[in-house]
Amino acid sequence: VLGGTAVLAAALPAAAAACAGGAETHPFAAFGDQASYVIAPGGTFESGAPGWTLTGAGIVAGNESFAATGTHSLAIGPGGRAVSPPVCVGAEYPTFRFFARQLAGDSDDTLTASLRWVDLLGITVESPAGAVTPSGSWEPSPIMRLGNSLPLWLPGATLDVQLVFTSSGGGSWAIDDAYIDPYSR
């Protein structure tokens, strides 16, 4: 039993120094969310989508006007998917948010967000984080769980996680300014 315990402990996410952060801002303050956030890797879409994997999605002109200046956003077509580059996440990164708007589709179409990581056995896992309901104007997403919904059992443990955005149904969407909460309130 001790040998099995040692193997399991070795397979747990490694305890590591806190993930490197970025410049903190309060992009959702106008909506009652006073939390500090850092931009996700490539999450502004102003320089394209470096490191993102896009299927049925691409950079377009136009963006939200609440959190940042810029002129671009990421459009995700019907059935399309956008996957962020890996981002280091620990328990101190409890949530994430972004801005979204529906470009076309029905009122029952949704934009879903999920988290992708590799588990202890080397299997890629994708778990739901939340969904955005249709709105023809730019709006902040709901606060979606991140670090507090991952298997981070050891103090200081981290995982490389990808944010996955999928257009469900026949709708198309635009997203902009994806932010991660570093829990430094």
Where are these regions (language model features)?
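C-terminal region of N-terminal signal peptides and the immediate post-cleavage residues
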Residues: 6-23
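Extracellular glycan-recognition surfaces and repeat-rich motifs
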Residues: 18, 23, 29-32, 38-73
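Short, surface-exposed beta-strand/strand-loop-strand elements in extracellular ectodomains
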Residues: 111-118
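Extracellular carbohydrate recognition
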Residues: 166-185
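Extracellular carbohydrate recognition and processing domains
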Residues: 31, 120-158, 166-170
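Short, conserved beta-strand segments of beta-strand-rich sandwich/propeller modules, principally
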Residues: 95, 158-162
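Solvent-exposed strand-to-loop "edge" motifs in beta-rich extracellular domains
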Residues: 46-50, 86-91, 97-106, 116, ...
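Short beta-strands within extracellular/lumenal beta-sheet-rich domains
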Residues: 70-95
